[in-house]
């Protein structure tokens, strides 16, 4: 049988391949996005597809829609960082066989394969694999981020982002549209440019919360677009006047959900618990340049993870930035080396 792992993260592809039963007699194939996945399917390489949802070119929903539209009988199991209830309902409605969250545990995959009749133990069986794309990596104690290391950071952020979105979706009873996280090492001037680019609205409200744990430290920053407050109040069933005090309460509630859930997910994957400081309001209804100038002394060279959250069918948008100190990068790189 031909099994296809379709995910834009090379790290996630390798992680999933390692989690499959060692005695499963299959040929493994790989695709880095939905279009490549469809090409592999048409080549006969996807009797069973393990499918990520958030990908460039064509996402997992697009793959399932294409399979359904073309009448292709390939079976798809979604393995996703986006674990919102609506994401589950959408993929099952598009004909997915099953849905599990990232990272997929070996015991979960084994139970799933048994449940759907894809696996039975046979003495001497080994998986015949087409090796996942990889390249030699040498640990670097400095701040260098290789493409392979960046890919791991992006996948860790993808899983954490999905967990935070799931909590927010349940709180608001709405669907959160998720992007592919941006990961970069930024100088101070570049960080200012990134903050300006992230904020495409006239004025913002911002909350910052510090965190620290075992050689890793940084700040989580929420940039909330002021045009979002009206719809956010509606989603949270806010009663009464929407004044600055009410907006601050909505802002803090949203920040607590997104920052707290993201940091828990990230810390769990690095096996490093974080202690979180008290959230600090950096400003309300202020232009991004004013926020940057007022707080520029806070930020130095940093590893930045940027995620834009949007609520489908509502004018609600905010940016979450995780800013890790330069000293933290070497510690995290070393932890990641043990995951590769």
Region spans (language model):
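Two-component/phosphorelay signaling modules centered on CheY-like receiver
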Residues: 10-29, 69
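Active-site residues of response regulator receiver
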Residues: 52, 80
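Composition-driven recognition of glycine/serine/threonine/acidic- and proline-rich low-complexity segments
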Residues: 87, 122, 127-147, 151-246, ...
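A Lys-centered signature of the CheY-like receiver
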Residues: 102
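Helix N-cap/capping motif at the beta->alpha junctions
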Residues: 30-39, 59-63
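Receiver (REC) domain active-site loop signature in two-component systems and cognate sites
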Residues: 55
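Active-site beta3 strand of CheY-like receiver
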Residues: 44-50
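Alpha4 helix (beta4-alpha4-beta5 surface) of REC/receiver domains from two-component response regulators
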Residues: 62, 83-98, 111, 121
């Amino acid at each position: 049988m031909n099994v296809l792992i379709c995910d834009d993260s090379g790290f996630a592809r390798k992680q999933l391949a390692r989690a499959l039963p060692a005695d499963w007699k299959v040929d493994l194939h790989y695709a880095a996005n939905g279009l490549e996945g469809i090409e592999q399917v048409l080549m006969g390489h996807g009797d069973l597809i393990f499918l990520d949802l958030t990908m460039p070119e064509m996402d997992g929903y697009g793959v399932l829609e294409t399979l359904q539209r073309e009448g292709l009988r390939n079976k798809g199991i979604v393995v996703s960082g986006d674990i919102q209830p609506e994401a589950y309902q959408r993929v099952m409605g598009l004909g997915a066989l099953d849905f599990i969250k990232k990272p997929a545990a070996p015991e979960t995959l084994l139970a799933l394969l048994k449940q759907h009749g894809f696996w039975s133990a046979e003495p001497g069986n080994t998986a015949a694999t087409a090796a996942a794309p990889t390249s030699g990596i040498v640990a670097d104690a400095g701040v260098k981020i290789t493409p392979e290391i960046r890919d791991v950071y992006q996948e860790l952020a993808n899983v954490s982002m999905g967990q935070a979105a799931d909590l927010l979706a349940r709180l608001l009873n709405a669907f959160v549209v998720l992007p592919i996280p941006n990961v970069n090492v930024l100088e101070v001037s570049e960080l200012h440019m990134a903050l300006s680019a992230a904020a495409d609205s006239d004025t913002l409200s911002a909350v910052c919360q510090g965190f620290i744990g075992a050689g890793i430290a940084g700040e989580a920053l929420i940039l909330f677009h002021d045009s979002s407050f009206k719809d956010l109040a509606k989603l949270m069933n806010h009663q009464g006047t929407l004044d600055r005090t009410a907006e601050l309460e909505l802002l803090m509630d949203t920040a607590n959900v997104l920052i707290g859930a993201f940091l828990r997910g990230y810390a769990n994957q690095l096996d490093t618990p974080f202690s979180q400081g008290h959230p600090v309001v950096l400003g309300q209804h202020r232009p991004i340049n004013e926020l940057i100038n007022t707080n520029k002394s806070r930020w130095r060279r940093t590893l930045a993870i940027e995620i834009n959250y949007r609520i489908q069918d509502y004018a609600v948008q905010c940016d979450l930035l995780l800013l890790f100190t330069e000293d933290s990068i070497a510690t995290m790189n070393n932890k990641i080396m043990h995951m590769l």
